[in-house]
Amino acid sequence: MTIDNSKKTSFGFRQVNEKDKAEMVGDVFDSVADNYDLMNDLMSFGIHRLWKKITVETAGLREDFKILDLAGGTGDMVKLMRSKISNQGSIILSDINWSMLHEGRNRLIDEGIEDVQMAQIDAQYLPFKENTFDLITIAFGLRNVTNKKTALELSLTHI
């Protein structure tokens, strides 16, 4: 009998090895990127849009904010936040999954929002200097991060 000493983390309703989760999550989002918002609408009866709107309205955004949206996927949070900041501010849409980031970029461009930077990054490994941002958001993407504590602690060092 072999003993599995690898660290476990949640993936849906089951526990998986931490080292396997990122690839599993990637496979899921590669397959759903173009229908992701529709899936969220169906699963939450559209309430996710209200939650995101309330989040943006209560975030205390200023015109000059520098914002990083982690696990930003299709860009719906970025779209809401972009209207609240001026050209003095900036937003980076980021996601670990290229398919989601590509979908987000296309949707933002279709909406006439072309001044948002894009970055394919993992929320657990931020490639920015500390204290770079005024606000870091991560909507529902936190559920897909392998080590949530690491990602949240790291985010705090970058605000």
Where are these regions (language model features)?
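Conserved alpha-helix/loop element of class I SAM-dependent methyltransferases that forms part
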Residues: N35-L38, F45-F65, L80
